[in-house]
Amino acid sequence: MENLYHQIAGSNFMIAFAGADGILLDTITDQSFGDTAAASSIRPGTIWTEASCGTNALGTVAHTGTPLMVHGAEHFFAQHGALTCIAAPVFDAQGVLAGVLDASSDCRSRQQHTRALVSMAATQIESGLFRECHRSEVLIVLHSRPEYLHPQRWSSGR
């Protein structure tokens, strides 16, 4: 979450992580976004399932397990109509949904690269879960681009 936040910090965003059950567990918020009325309803402990909030990125991704963007009036409740929310699923080492990573902002903020950044961050979390699950085993890591291989991080369990 922190890596994603630092990539988009200062651009009026909130990063959020919810469990597979749609309950918001943690957020990191730009001050500019945190001061908005919309941000006041996005806080740890709130429930974002489709059953309780209608169409929203966190709840819909928790339900479908696929990445999604919900923009403005696509939200079920009008109170969230000024937001754009981009979410991606996070799966554990066994392929079970572990949670949902989300980046939310007001609809006027630039969204050009956010989808890719959220998906990449979700993949990084999944890699960490996989490494943790298999930390007592020898892992062989292959990639066509060497800059994506970080043996020191893999072997230290980070």
Q: Can you describe what each PLM-predicted range is?
A:
Residues 1-49, 60-69, 82, 91-157:
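Intrinsically disordered, low-complexity terminal regulatory regions
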Residues 50-54:
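Phosphate/pyrophosphate-binding betaalpha-module
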Residues 75-91:
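Helix-to-coil/beta transition segments that act as allosteric "coupling" elements at the rims
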Residues 73-77, 144-145:
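Short, solvent-exposed loop/turn elements at beta->coil junctions and helix N-caps
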